[in-house]
């Protein structure tokens, strides 16, 4: 006997209230999607039942003929969407209809707080789903029972979408879910068989499940003799779109299938459809979304493709077909060579899976290469949404590292913009004849990278430098050491080596070294453990000092990232480099007062650290020393 309450009134969580408001006020111009969303939910429920019934056939309850029924009642102004899928328990009803998935709650709040996203963007990211019912209905009733539970464990959910919902236990002899929409006064257009059929054909023709409606039969010659009989007929094609030849599928059909499997509100950016025949037979239909999902950076979150075996649904989120750096890809894999009862554990060590995965990766990379070459505007949209994720690729996929590297885009000193639109091929095409390295700098922000004093000699020599400021960039350059025979070189690590491009500067520096030997010793004595070394440099033209790190040590930027993530590591000390031609350095060189010299040494080091992006450990002392030097000048 259940101890659950028979009836209770509960409040939606705050995020659901916001989403309901957005749905009701932002989707009115496209209100017919409510039927697409509810049919999609029913289809998912049938897929889940099929999968769970593979290991427990009793869940079918002697009814394995899965369908979706659509009906309407003009007199009572209702539309009913009913299925015999998996159904829901009381707890699942509360979780699925009363809350946004826990993984999305925080992101939803942040987007609302920032107010950067348009309403359609919010809805696109979090999915309209069940809540779309309130576009056309002012009251929604859901009756459901989970497969395998007793008839008296049915649940009825009811809400007007304003802030609360009621739950009560009911008797429900059949498993599955029934959604009853009580339409608003202005929505009579949907109380029409032809209108509903047109929507089903437009949005849900591809649904594998039969969608059934009552058929209207007529008898006699006159309209007055028409007789309605409740005979049923299937109103969708109910076939697997992906098994059809590509030339038989319209773009709109591809788009609607994407919206169904990805639960997305927007059209996909691009897709690729492929059938492999021979020793291994499988079909893939892979999509690149137009917009990044809210949980893109959650590497532990749900991802992957829908897996079918011989057109029978097996599982959602089969992550084994795509590497982590392509986790944004949505789509379908339909294999003829896998067993129907394959488990997630078996997927991990299956040779067929590995071959299909290699094929999927190859096709997505080819699709991206085609976009990059032939549709630069669309590729720019892709890069803005998913570029940072693709940058994980060289570290994770050695076999395709060169192909991925060719798809990468960066900001650079060639363009006065933070837009990442420079490829490594572009960079190489503009290299100086004597240049043999690809130079880059990684900083906390684009502005910090662009204004770094380390760029001064490169600007003087008109040598392009890639400006990197994504958190993933340090990870990228640690695994992408060269491209087309050109090594990647950080300008923030090691000694500057421009080869033949810096002959004159090297000669000048050698002249200064003996004259500045005593000054360097004084700097080392005053700064002590704050630095690893101090030396003269020719990389500066306008700034008095800069800091760099040894070639084999972590950069300052990488160290800051590790500190932010709570990592424990041995911090590298910076190397202070001074510009022997700068007036400030010449003034300090001639400073005879030891106290003032010490202040100057601290000031010049702290200036360099600030320019590098470092946070000063004692900013108050820095300001005090600066003020004292200003008063003395």
UniProtKB/Swiss-Prot annotation:
One of its GO terms (molecular function) is ATP hydrolysis activity. Residues 561-633 are annotated as: C. It comes from the Bacteria. GO terms for cellular component: cytoplasm. Residues 1-344 are annotated as: A. It is found in: Cytoplasm. Transmembrane segments: none annotated. Keywords: ATP-binding, Chaperone, Cytoplasm, Nucleotide-binding, Stress response. Residues 345-560 are annotated as: B. Belongs to the heat shock protein 90 family. Molecular chaperone. Has ATPase activity. Homodimer. This is Chaperone protein HtpG.
């Amino acid at each position: 006997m259940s101890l659950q309450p028979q009836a209770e009134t509960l409040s939606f969580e705050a995020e659901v209230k916001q989403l309901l408001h957005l749905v009701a006020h932002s989707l009115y111009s496209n209100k017919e999607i409510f039927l697409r969303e509810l049919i999609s939910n029913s289809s998912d429920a049938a897929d889940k039942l099929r999968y769970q019934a593979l290991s427990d056939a009793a869940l079918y309850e002697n009814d394995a003929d899965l369908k979706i029924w659509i009906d309407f009642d003009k007199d009572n102004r209702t539309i009913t969407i009913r299925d015999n899928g998996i159904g829901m328990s009381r707890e699942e009803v509360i979780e699925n209809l009363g809350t946004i998935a826990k993984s999305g709650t925080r992101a939803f709040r942040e987007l609302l707080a920032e107010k950067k996203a348009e309403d359609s963007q919010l809805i696109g990211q979090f999915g309209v789903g069940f809540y779309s019912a309130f576009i056309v209905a002012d009251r929604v009733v859901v009756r459901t029972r989970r497969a395998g539970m007793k008839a008296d464990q049915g649940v009825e959910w009811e809400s007007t979408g304003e802030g609360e919902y009621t739950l009560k236990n009911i008797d429900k002899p059949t498993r599955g879910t029934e959604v009853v929409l009580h339409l608003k006064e202005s929505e009579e257009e949907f109380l029409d068989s032809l209108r509903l059929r047109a929507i089903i054909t437009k949005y849900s023709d591809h649904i594998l499940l039969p969608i059934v409606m009552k058929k209207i039969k007529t008898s006699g010659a006159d309209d007055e003799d028409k007789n309605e009989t409740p005979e049923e007929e299937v109103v969708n094609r109910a076939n697997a779109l992906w098994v059809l030849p590509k030339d038989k599928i319209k773009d709109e059909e591809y788009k609607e299938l994407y919206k169904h499997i990805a639960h997305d509100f927007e059209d996909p950016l691009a897709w690729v459809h492929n059938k492999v025949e021979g020793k291994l037979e499988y079909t893939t239909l892979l999509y690149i979304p137009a917009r990044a999902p809210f949980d893109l950076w959650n590497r532990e979150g749900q991802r992957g493709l829908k897996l079918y075996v011989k057109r029978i649904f097996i599982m959602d989120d089969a992550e084994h077909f795509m590497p982590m750096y392509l986790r944004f890809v949505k789509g379908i894999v339909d294999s003829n060579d896998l067993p129907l009862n394959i488990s997630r554990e078996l997927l991990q060590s299956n040779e067929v899976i590995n071959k299909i995965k290699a094929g999927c990766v190859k096709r997505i990379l080819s699709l991206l290469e085609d976009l990059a070459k032939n549709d630069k505007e669309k590729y720019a949209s892709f890069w803005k949404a998913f570029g940072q994720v693709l940058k994980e690729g060289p570290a994770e996929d050695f076999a395709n590292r060169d192909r991925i590297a060719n798809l990468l885009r960066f900001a650079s000193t060639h363009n006065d913009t933070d837009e990442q639109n420079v490829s490594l091929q572009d960079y190489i095409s503009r290299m100086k004849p004597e240049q043999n390295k690809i130079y880059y700098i990684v900083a906390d922000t684009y502005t910090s990278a662009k204004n770094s004093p380390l760029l001064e000699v490169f600007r003087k020599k008109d040598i392009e430098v890639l400006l990197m400021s994504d958190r993933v960039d340090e990870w990228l350059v640690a695994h992408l050491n060269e491209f087309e025979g050109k090594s990647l070189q950080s300008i923030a690590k090691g000694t500057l080596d421009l080869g033949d491009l810096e002959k004159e500067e090297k000669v000048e520096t050698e002249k200064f070294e003996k004259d500045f030997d005593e000054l360097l010793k004084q700097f080392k004595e005053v700064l002590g453990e704050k630095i690893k070394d101090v030396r003269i440099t020719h990389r500066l033209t306008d700034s008095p000092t800069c800091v760099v790190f040894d070639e084999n040590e972590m950069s300052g930027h990488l160290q800051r990232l590790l500190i932010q993530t709570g990592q424990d590591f041995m911090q590298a000390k910076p190397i202070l480099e001074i510009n022997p031609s700068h007036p400030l350095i010449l003034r300090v060189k001639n400073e005879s007062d030891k106290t003032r010299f010490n202040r100057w040494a601290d000031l010049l080091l702290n200036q360099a650290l600030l320019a590098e992006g470092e946070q000063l450990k004692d900013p108050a002392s820095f300001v005090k020393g600066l003020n004292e030097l200003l008063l003395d000048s």
